[in-house]
A protein has these predicted regions:
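A structural signal for the main folded, soluble domain(s) of proteins
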Residues: 6, 22-23, 156
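Conserved lysine of the Walker
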Residues: 34
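N-terminal pre-Walker A segment at the start of P-loop NTPase domains
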Residues: 1-14
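Solvent-exposed residues in well-ordered beta-strands and their adjoining turns
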Residues: 8, 21, 85-89, 112-116, ...
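Conserved P-loop NTP-binding catalytic core
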Residues: 39-108, 115-118
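Phosphate-binding P-loop
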Residues: 15-21
């Protein structure tokens, strides 16, 4: 389940932030950005599922350049940035069907994708930053809304306060399988599609 989402450089979103509850209703007039929010979730889900960035972009509506925020006529943002805070299942299954319990169930995932020209003079898409870490209680605004008596139902108690970095491509530091991390992200995003209701307002 997604608890917080920040988007920058995707379609109409510029430093856009939204917090989610177990049931969230998105209401607004036509062309207010509701569809763009679901398009962003769709892109995030595909990016977590596939290894080919271009494939994930091509599956979206329109040309890939149109997914970047248009700043002026024929001028588009160079980067798309996502920041997702999520509550994931307490167990994860790997590619071989093995299950393992998770120590941390509240995570923050950050992803930055940039447009750049490759050596052949063709515009390409590259991941310039990818970061996944656990959220401490003090950093998790969503968990502050949960009554203390039911807090353990949402996230297990962790006695250590040391932050664990699960993915950090900027430092080329890998402390767990990228497959599992992306699968957790994908599960959280897919779960969000069932808990968010979109409504048109006249």
């Amino acid at each position: 389940m997604i608890t917080y989402l920040k988007i920058n450089g995707f379609k109409s979103f510029h430093n856009f932030e939204v917090s989610f509850t177990p049931l969230t209703v998105i209401a607004g007039i036509n062309a207010s950005g509701k569809s763009n929010l679901f398009d962003a979730l769709s892109l995030l889900s595909r990016l977590a599922e596939v290894d080919n960035i271009k494939k994930a972009f091509k599956e979206q509506h329109g040309e890939f350049i149109e997914l970047f925020t248009q700043l002026d006529r024929d001028v588009y943002a160079q980067e798309i940035e996502f920041c997702v805070e999520m509550l994931v299942n307490r167990t994860i299954k790997d590619a071989w069907g093995n299950k393992a319990p998770l120590r941390y169930t509240c995570l923050r995932y950050e992803l930055t994708i940039r447009r750049q020209t490759n050596s052949s003079g063709i515009e390409d898409l590259v991941v310039v930053a990818e970061h996944l870490e656990n959220l401490k209680h003090l950093e998790d605004n969503w968990v502050k809304q949960i009554p203390k008596e039911t807090l353990r139902d949402w996230r297990p108690e962790v006695k250590t306060g040391k932050k664990v970095y699960l993915i950090c491509l900027q430092k080329q530091k890998m402390l767990c399988q990228l497959y599992l991390c992306r699968k957790m992200v994908c599960q959280a995003i897919d779960g969000a599609s069932h808990s968010i209701i979109r409504r048109e307002r006249c």
